Amino acid sequence: MVDRRKSQAGQEDGRVFLVVVDDSEELHQALYFACRRAKRLNGRIALMYCIRPAEFQHFAGVGELMREEAREQAENMLRVNSEWVHDLTGKNPMVYLREGDPRVEVINLINEDEQISILILGANTKGDSTGPLIRYLTTKGAAECPVPITIVPGNLSDEDIDRLT
């Protein structure tokens, strides 16, 4: 796994940039940054949305209805963001829909798909702390992540990102 990623990282094409899709404001910056890098390096984008199962621990019928609604919302968010990725890069992204703890599922996905060569996350710059995924991946989860992590500040404009990429 590691050897394959090392060989891909030296190439100017074939890189896959993983972006975790959620409803945060900083998703825009992370995804725009990833698209600009992928376009420049002839790479691809992978989008992952993770449905948290703890949201469905109610009565069986209500829980199942909530699960279906969450899946519809996830599929819609992936569709909308996939269209934007295609508009920015000219390529359709790889799309992953998972259920579980995002901290676990992002590591699992990276370990399963050796094409993924970098993880791009957006950071909340309006609050007092980062989100739970960034907090985890920059502390004890860092040892589990086999690819570099790029954290894009949520206060960057598209023009700022254009200059950086």
Walk through the language-model features, giving the residues of each.
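General small-molecule cofactor/ligand-binding pocket signal
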Residues: A46-M48, M94-R98, T150-V152
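Small/aliphatic-rich secondary-structure junction motif
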Residues: S7-G61
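Glycine-rich, Arg-bearing micro-motifs that act as flexible, cationic patches
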Residues: I118-A143, L156-D162
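Structural beta-alpha unit
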Residues: M1-Q8, H86-L119, E159, T165
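Conserved acidic residues
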Residues: R15, I116-I118, P146
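Acidic, proline/glycine-rich short linear motifs
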Residues: S7, Y49-N76, E159-T165
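Short, well-ordered secondary-structure micro-motifs
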Residues: A30, Q57-A60, I107-N108, G131-P132, ...
